[in-house]
Amino acid sequence: IPAIKTFDEVQQKIGSDKIQEAMESIGISMNKENIGLASAIGGWSYGISPLEMAGAYATISNNGLYTESHTINYVEVVQTGETFNIDEEIQNNAKQSAYSKASAFMVRQVMLDYTKNGSGNYAYVSGINNVGAKTGTSNWSSSAKNGMAGKSRDLWMSAYTSDYICSVWMGFGKEGIDKGKTTSQYKAYPGKVVQTLLNHLQSKGSQKSYPDQPDDVEQAAMVKGIYPYVSPSEGMSEDMIIQAWFKKGTAPTQSVDS
């Protein structure tokens, strides 16, 4: 599984403490979590709230800059007319997350591409201008009771545009779980909700643009399906070649024939 393989490589290189710091830098509470390989595919003790997830996704469209998630714009004191601009204060206190502008740009471009050309639940949002999205599913363990073993436990879709972020979670409370309900038959619902929200919010078009490409990022050709990455050889079929984003100096230099 690519996510687990990547997580394992990163964990071995920088350690669990650095991973925890990176997660906390984008607003995800890690106080009660034990970081391990299962974390890469949703194996969390307590999990992430939609509010935390939306705040984390906002960094992708905002150059890696983290702004604390909040639901209050301002507070006005009726008796005095005094106004406290909560949103303005939080925006002014935004902090750079653990990852760079270059990383945010590359993640954003990859997500925009596969969302635009995606199938399944991505089809619900693929027609929205400049949208990037990711779905998520977790299943009950093989030891779960009441016939729940291996069945779908909850569903996600989180998405962003240059203006808005939304994160939708779907699952059942104890009563539904006790009745044996699973999310298996409702897989399309998060995508439909995200589609409805963004279509409404974006009905007048985009107000902002994504940040420009950083100077330390470049695009280069590489061969599909080969890792470590290699550059295409002369005369290779175009079907085997894709354009990918790299930090400058890290694009593949060896060809597939080397």
PLM region descriptions:
Residues 1-30, 34-62, 110-113:
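Active-site-adjacent helix/loop patches that line small-molecule binding or acyl-intermediate pockets
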Residues 47-258:
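A penicillin-recognizing enzyme superfamily signal
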